[in-house]
A protein has these predicted regions:
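Generic detector of contiguous secondary-structure segments
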Residues: 21-48
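Structural detector for tandem alpha-solenoid helical repeats, activating at a conserved register
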Residues: 30, 73, 104-105
C-alpha cells in the first residue's frame, strides 16, 4: 500500500486482509463501526491477528508515531460489538497483546467489558429461569 493513496483508494486496496482489518489499520472508526453493524465478525482473524489485537497494535503504533496520547476508540468499538479479548491466536490473545504493548487503557476497557458481559449473561440466565 502506497502512503500517497487517498482514503477511498486505501479502503479499496486489494490486500489479503478483510475490509474490517483495513479499517482498523487506517484508524477508520466510522467505517469499522459500519462494517460491524452490517455483520462483520468482531472476532475475525487475518494475518494471525484478531481485529482486537490489530486495533491495539494500531492504537499503540499511531501514538508512538504521532507523539499524541494513546487513543482506544478502535478497541472500544470492537468490544461494544462483542470482540473477545481472551480469544487466542497462536497462543496469544488481545489481552496479552495489550499487556505486552503497555496499552493500559485497552486493558481497563477489556476488564470493564468482560465484567459487564459476565454480569449481563448472569442477569439473562436469571431472567430466563423465571
Amino acid at each position: 500500500m502506497d502512503a500517497s493513496m487517498t482514503m477511498a483508494e486505501a479502503l479499496n486496496y486489494k490486500s489479503p486482509c478483510t475490509p474490517a482489518h483495513r479499517a482498523v489499520e487506517l484508524s477508520e472508526h466510522a467505517t469499522l463501526t459500519r462494517l460491524l453493524d452490517e455483520g462483520a465478525d468482531a472476532d475475525e482473524v487475518c494475518c494471525r491477528m484478531t481485529l482486537l489485537m490489530h486495533a491495539i497494535d494500531t492504537e499503540v503504533d499511531v501514538a508512538n508515531q504521532s507523539g499524541e496520547p494513546i487513543d482506544s476508540a478502535l478497541t472500544a468499538v470492537l468490544l461494544a460489538y462483542g470482540a473477545d479479548p481472551h480469544l487466542a491466536v497462536n497462543g496469544q490473545a488481545a489481552y496479552d497483546c495489550a499487556r505486552e504493548l503497555r496499552h493500559d487503557m485497552a486493558i481497563r476497557l477489556m476488564d470493564r467489558f468482560s465484567t459487564r458481559t459476565t454480569k449481563l449473561a448472569a442477569r439473562f440466565r436469571r431472567g430466563r429461569r423465571r
